[in-house]
Amino acid sequence: MSRRNRAPKRDILPDPKFKSQVVAKFVNHIMLDGKKSIAEKIVYGAFDKIKAKDASANEVEVFEKALDSVSPMVEVKSRRVGGATYQVPVEVRPERRQTLGMRWIIDAARKRKESTMGDRVAAEILEAIEGRGAAVKKREDTHKMAEANKAFAHFRW
C-alpha cells in the first residue's frame, strides 16, 4: 500500500463556447500531445454538424443525452478468491460512468471510416442517441458480462 496521500481533485474550468464542464472534459479526453486548440476544433466541429442535422436541438443537451445512453451502470472487476479469479459485477460511480462513456465514444469514433475526426465524433454521438453504434454496443457487452456473472456479486468488497 502506498503511504502517499491521494492527489487532490482538480477543478475543470468550463469550456469557453458552451460554458459546460462536461464539454470541457470531453475536449480534454480528445486532446492528444497537449494540443487543446485542435481538440476544441474537433469537438466544436462535431457539435456544428449535430446542429446542422437538427437545428432545433441544443448541441450540449444532445451530447449529454448520448453520453448518458453510452455510460455503463455496472461493470465487472476481477477478484481473486482461493486461487480462482472471478469477474465480480460492481456498480459504477457517477464520475467513472461519465469518463467511461466519453472514452468509449472517442474510441468508437477513432475506429470509424469518416474523413475527419469531427465527422466521426458527430456520427458516433448521433448513433448513440438512436441506441446503435460501437459505443452503445460496448455498454451492452459490459452489462451482459455483469449479468452473466451476477452469481459472484456476493464477492463484492
Swiss-Prot record:
SUPFAM superfamilies, per the entry: Ribosomal protein S7
Gene Ontology BP, a term: translation
MF annotations from Gene Ontology: rRNA binding; structural constituent of ribosome; tRNA binding
HAMAP family: Ribosomal_uS7_B
Family: Belongs to the universal ribosomal protein uS7 family.
Functional description taken from the UniProt entry: One of the primary rRNA binding proteins, it binds directly to 16S rRNA where it nucleates assembly of the head domain of the 30S subunit. Is located at the subunit interface close to the decoding center, probably blocks exit of the E-site tRNA.
Protein name per its UniProtKB record: Small ribosomal subunit protein uS7
Organism expressing this protein natively: Francisella philomiragia subsp. philomiragia (strain ATCC 25017 / CCUG 19701 / FSC 153 / O#319-036)
Recorded name of the encoding gene: rpsG
